[in-house]
């Protein structure tokens, strides 16, 4: 079990790191669109000094995503293994994944609980990331951001927006896992017309087929789950950037709707869908491929 856990830690860390660095511009633009009172994405882009400004906040993003993904994927697999109780693919079945197979309800609950918990654990990094990306605060470094937050808000400042974060992350991950696992079963016959008539002597589909199926399933699932949970993300961002104006979840929702209308809760949705869909496609594809490679090589994973 220890060796298998290392596989998931390494695969999760790598997938999170790659997706964070590649997709940081989407995250920064999403944060600034959500913090503004009606500014369009074009206006936000024009306000940037140089193209490199799009990668402002990459360090905390990479730290949060790499560590968070390592924790999430490892804990998720542990929980799913325990829930599955030894269930395996039936003889003749092939898969794009080496992960345990669960029912829809089990996927929904396990994904939600694990993601919600991990989200709370990495909250301090998330708060630093959001403030560093925004145009409201002008921190000189990550250390300066952390010091300033602690000086003005104490330890409590690192957990602003925790309720909105949990309300966003748990449903998002639960819905994501539900749709992701279903799509992985449905997509092979849709994307590849001859895949169901090919030989079933192999346990998994080819690496290329698996990557295509997993990426499309991940991106589609992320788009659906993101749309459903975007209001919570908007509220979370406001609470972390202006805690005095948005002191708690319910007050924040009321304030936003009263002053900007209900549509403001979906501000930044297009950017978030783009980022989440791409992030899911990249991270889950890399993660599942690395886990399968370790399994095929019968290796315990890199030494940590």
UniProtKB/Swiss-Prot annotation:
It is found in: Mitochondrion inner membrane. Mitochondrial glycine transporter that imports glycine into the mitochondrial matrix. Plays an important role in providing glycine for the first enzymatic step in heme biosynthesis, the condensation of glycine with succinyl-CoA to produce 5-aminolevulinate (ALA) in the mitochondrial matrix. The chain crosses the membrane at residues 9-34, 57-83, 108-133, 161-184, 213-239, 268-286. SUPFAM superfamilies: Mitochondrial carrier (SSF103506). Keywords: Membrane, Mitochondrion, Mitochondrion inner membrane, Repeat, Transmembrane, Transmembrane helix, Transport. It catalyses: glycine(in) = glycine(out). This is Mitochondrial glycine transporter. One of its GO terms (cellular component) is mitochondrial inner membrane. Pfam families: Mito_carr. Belongs to the mitochondrial carrier (TC 2.A.29) family. SLC25A38 subfamily. It comes from Yarrowia lipolytica (strain CLIB 122 / E 150) (Yeast). The keyword Transmembrane applies. It comes from the Eukaryota. GO terms for biological process: glycine import into mitochondrion; heme biosynthetic process. It is a multi-pass membrane protein. The keyword Chloroplast does not apply.
């Amino acid at each position: 079990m220890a060796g298998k856990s290392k596989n998931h830690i390494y695969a999760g860390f790598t997938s999170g790191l790659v997706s964070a660095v590649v997709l940081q511009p989407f995250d920064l633009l999403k944060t600034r669109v959500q913090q503004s009172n009606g500014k369009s994405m074009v206006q936000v882009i024009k306000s940037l000094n140089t193209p490199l400004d799009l990668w402002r906040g990459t360090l905390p993003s990479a730290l949060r995503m790499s560590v968070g993904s390592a924790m999430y994927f490892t804990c998720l697999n542990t929980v799913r293994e325990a829930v599955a109780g030894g269930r395996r693919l039936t003889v003749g079945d092939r898969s794009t994944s080496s992960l345990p197979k669960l029912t829809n309800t089990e996927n929904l609950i396990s994904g939600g609980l694990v993601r919600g918990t991990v989200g709370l654990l990495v909250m301090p990094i998330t708060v630093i990331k959001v403030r560093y990306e925004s145009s409201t605060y002008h921190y000189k470094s990550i250390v300066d951001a952390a010091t300033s937050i602690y000086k003005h808000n104490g330890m409590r400042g690192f957990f602003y927006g925790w309720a909105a974060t949990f309300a966003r992350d748990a449903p998002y991950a639960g819905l994501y896992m539900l749709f992701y696992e279903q799509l992985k079963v449905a997509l092979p016959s849709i994307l590849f017309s001859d895949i169901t008539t090919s030989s079933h002597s192999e346990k998994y589909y080819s690496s290329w087929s698996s990557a295509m199926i997993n990426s499309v399933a991940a991106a589609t699932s992320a788009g659906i789950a993101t749309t459903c949970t975007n209001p919570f993300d908007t509220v979370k961002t406001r609470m972390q950037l202006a805690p005095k104006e948005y002191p708690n979840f319910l007050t924040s929702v009321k304030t936003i709707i009263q002053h900007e209308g209900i549509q403001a809760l979906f501000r930044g949705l297009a950017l978030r869908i783009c980022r989440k869909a791409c992030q899911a496609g990249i991270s889950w594809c890399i993660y599942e491929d690395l886990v399968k490679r370790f399994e095929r090589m019968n290796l315990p994973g890199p030494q940590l």
